[in-house]
């Protein structure tokens, strides 16, 4: 199977984490020697699969491979430093989950998937998804059904817990530097031009104590967490900082949204009405325009517009949205 650079980093990272797990080690336990030796071993086994062996084709390609491997090592070092500052332990990598749901008509269906990484401290859970692009998710995108991934993962973990309490601590995309470029020739100095420091985006608990458990450096430039801390030890109430009640509302909304999407699919609804959000549409990347022939200039065809709302404003709307979406449907007046 051919891999692109992003998948290369993703696969390498998972393999490194799996090796640590088999040795009952956490990221913080990895030594410099572990990172050097294991990363080289992993890279040599995965690199031939990148773009059908393109990294071994000539000197410039081997230079690109060297840059990619250095990026991988830098990512490992960054994750290790974060782990040293965290009280959470990684409990699972590529964790499979099965979410069992029931539609309004009584039909049941199962949604399954795989979570890149699950960290825990007691009943506190953090869900992480590795991304090579700078993926983000706003609350309005989640509520409207555009970005359901992280909350769906949390729903799956909640079901597995089978009634045992789980407190969401973080739902985050962790960025991997997958933007190493193929070069046509080796630069004169031979030194790889590496991407900037990795970061993260997502949603964090409003509990200051838990935030510092996630990363004792929270609020500093060294922390990976997308959060700012106040002098009293609590995070600033920005749009991505959520209370337990906020998470509960989102889980109810996302669960209902998934059920609604299922019901639309089984009912045969195939409206050609692509979403448009912040001036962008999936049509930009879709290879099937010649089949659907969507044309917004025609009166009978139009986009499904999603209006941008700030996370801070959206948080205030969550209780009402959760209530409206999950209240029992009224019976038809004609019986």
Regions found by a protein language model. Name each.
Residues 1-335:
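Structural signature of nuclease core domains in nucleic-acid processing machines
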């Amino acid at each position: 199977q051919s891999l692109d650079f992003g998948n290369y980093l993703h696969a390498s990272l998972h393999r490194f984490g799996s090796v640590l797990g088999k040795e009952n080690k956490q990221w913080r336990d990895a030594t410099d020697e572990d990172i050097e030796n294991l990363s080289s071993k992993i890279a040599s086994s995965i690199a031939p699969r990148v773009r059908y062996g393109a990294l071994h084709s000539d000197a410039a390609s081997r230079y690109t491979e060297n840059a990619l491997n250095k990026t991988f090592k830098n990512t490992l070092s960054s994750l290790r430093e974060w782990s040293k500052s965290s009280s959470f332990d990684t409990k699972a990598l590529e964790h499979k989950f099965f979410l069992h749901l029931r539609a309004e008509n009584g039909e049941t269906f199962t949604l399954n998937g795989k979570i890149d990484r699950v960290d825990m401290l007691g009943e506190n859970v953090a869900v992480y998804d590795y991304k090579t692009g700078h993926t983000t998710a706003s609350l309005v995108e989640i509520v409207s059904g555009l970005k359901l991934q992280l909350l769906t993962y949390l729903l799956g973990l909640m079901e597995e817990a089978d009634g045992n309490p789980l407190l969401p601590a973080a739902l985050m995309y962790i960025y991997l530097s997958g933007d190493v470029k193929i070069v046509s020739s080796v630069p004169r100095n031979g030194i790889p031009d590496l991407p900037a420091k990795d970061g993260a985006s997502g949603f964090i608990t409003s509990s200051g104590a838990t935030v510092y458990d996630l990363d004792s450096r929270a609020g500093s430039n060294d922390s990976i967490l997308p959060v700012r801390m106040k002098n009293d030890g609590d995070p600033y109430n920005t749009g991505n900082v959520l209370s337990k009640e906020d998470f509960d509302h989102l889980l109810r909304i996302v669960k209902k949204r998934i059920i609604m999407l299922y019901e639309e699919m089984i009912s045969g609804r195939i409206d050609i009405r692509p979403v448009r959000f912040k001036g962008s549409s999936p049509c930009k990347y879709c290879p099937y325009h010649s089949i659907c022939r969507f044309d917004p200039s025609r009166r009978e065809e139009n986009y499904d517009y999603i209006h941008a709302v700030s996370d801070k404003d959206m948080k205030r709307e969550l209780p009402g949205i959760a209530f409206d979406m999950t209240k029992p449907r009224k019976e038809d007046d004609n019986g």
